[in-house]
Each structure stands twice: as C-alpha cells, then as structure tokens.
C-alpha cells in the first residue's frame, strides 16, 4: 500500500472580550457539527500553509472575514483518522493517508459590536446564496459549506455538538493552549 501525506489547516481567529478569549466558530451544513475553520491545502500552498488558512477563512465565512495581516501562533499535528467513506476510497486507491494539520491561531481585535456585524454579514451572504439556489442560479460552493457562525468562549463552544477531530486534536491538546497563551507571536502580511 502506497503512503500519502496530505496537508490541511485549521484557522482559529480569537479575540479577547473582557479578557476572555472568544473564538470564531462555524457549523458545518452537512454534518451539523460546530468547528473551527478547516480545509485542505492546494499543492502550491503546502510550503506556505498560512495562505491556505487565510483562503479557507475567507471561503468558509462566505467572504466576510478577509484577513491580510496580523499576528498568529501555530502548531502542527498528524492523524490517520479518516471517515468510513474516506477509508473506503483510500482502500480502492491503494493508499494509506496521513493528514498533516497546520493549526493557526489568529489574534484579532474585534469588539462585541463588530462580532455581531460579522455574524450579520455572514447571515446576509447566506440568504443571498439561498435565494440563488432557489432561483436555480450558480453559486460558489466553497461559500456554502457552513450554515451558522458564532463568536464563542470555549465554555459555550464545548456545550455544542462539535466535530470529534476538534475535540480530540485541538480542545484536548496542550499544544493548543500553549499556542493560545504564547507571547511569541509571529506577524504576517499577505498581499
């Protein structure tokens, strides 16, 4: 069996409201699970996964969150966990897949009012897509992966139905808290 490595990202915008971290979270339309922004890297993005994270952040927020510069911390983890459908596909292709996840925590200053405005814009964009679907017009499928967006504390996020990978590899991972609390932040400026 051939071994294959694929690269994915988790983009986790965080803002501190009243000294408590609030995370931008979305709910996956298909599986009804809450998660951080996630997606696969294109071949040209593998060597610079922050570009992938920023692209996914824009796509999965329906174009509402488009970040070009700021501060971040990051870490990586690997997993061979795959869905039953993916495992069946891997078996047919004769590959054993390892996924390398690049986790980026983006530190942002977003007031409570701005958070509400971002969610409102997301809902407006969602309504526009629903109208286009109803009228049988083309839509950007990448902008239609998530049906809800929220800024949540971890306490609130942990009460929701979450994707197992987020729980096991992020929320329960000490590397996440090290990155979140690190003052050794890197800057980025993508044009």
Where are the predicted features?
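Functional cleft and adjacent loop/helix regions within the main domain
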Residues: 32-33, 37-39, 43, 82-98, ...
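Conserved N-terminal beta-strand and adjoining loop/helix that marks the start
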Residues: 1-23, 42, 102
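Residue-level detector of short, conserved catalytic/binding motifs and their immediate flanks
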Residues: 7-11, 49, 147
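Conserved Nudix-box catalytic region and its N-terminal flanking loop in Nudix hydrolases
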Residues: 20-66
């Amino acid at each position: 069996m051939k071994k294959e490595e694929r690269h994915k990202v988790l983009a986790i915008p965080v803002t501190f409201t009243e000294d408590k971290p609030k995370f931008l979270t979305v709910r996956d339309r298909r599986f009804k699970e809450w998660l951080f922004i996630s997606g696969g890297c294109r071949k040209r993005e593998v060597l610079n996964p922050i570009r992938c994270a920023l692209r996914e952040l824009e796509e999965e927020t329906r174009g509402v969150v488009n970040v070009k510069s700021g501060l971040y911390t990051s870490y990586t983890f690997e997993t061979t966990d795959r869905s039953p459908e993916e495992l069946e596909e891997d078996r047919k292709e004769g590959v054993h897949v390892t996924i390398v996840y690049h986790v980026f925590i983006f530190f942002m200053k977003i007031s409570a009012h701005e958070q509400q405005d971002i969610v409102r814009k997301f809902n407006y964009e969602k309504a526009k897509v629903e109208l286009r679907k109803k009228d049988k017009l083309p839509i950007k499928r990448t902008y239609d992966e998530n049906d809800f967006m929220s800024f949540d504390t971890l306490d609130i996020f942990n009460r929701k139905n979450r994707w197992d990978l987020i729980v096991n590899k992020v929320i329960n991972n000490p590397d996440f808290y090290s990155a979140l609390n690190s003052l050794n932040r890197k800057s980025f400026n993508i044009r």
